[in-house]
Amino acid sequence: PPLHEFLPHEDDEIKELADEMGVSFDKLKGKVESLHEFNPMLGTRGCRLDVLYPEIAEMQTEAIVSAAINVWKEDDLHITPEIMVPLVSEVNELRFVKKVIKAKADELIEQSGLKMKYMVGTMIETPRAAVTAGDVAKEAEFFSFGTNDLTQMTYGFSRDDVGRILETYFDKKIL
């Protein structure tokens, strides 16, 4: 989801969160307002969050790898976590985020003493990623296809409103 979906919107919500965080209402409200986006579906989401805030990728990697380590140790199930980087448009985005993921995952696995393997892949969900999939494949160990966003960005249809448009397009043999 876009970044704004994780943020409080109403003043009372901002005040409550500011109190919990031990920061001023004005400081938090200013931060929330600075993160507002006019078109969040094409804004700060997916791997863009990880590029802007690498600590998010670190935290998510720690959660995934720590859970896998616990399963190995507690249940003796030798699993291979597959960590997927979403909404990649450019191979350098994946390369950057993969480096963050690998650093954290390798650190945790070394500390555990296990010989656990993991994979880092991506979701192809932008036209740019689809067109440059050959380059992206050099960095990704697996692919998944995000057809909702890929279709939305390719055709310029809103996935929330496309139903009524597509019915007519199909009837008129446009698509």
Language-model segments: what does each one mean?
Residues 1-175:
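Conserved alpha/beta-domain cores
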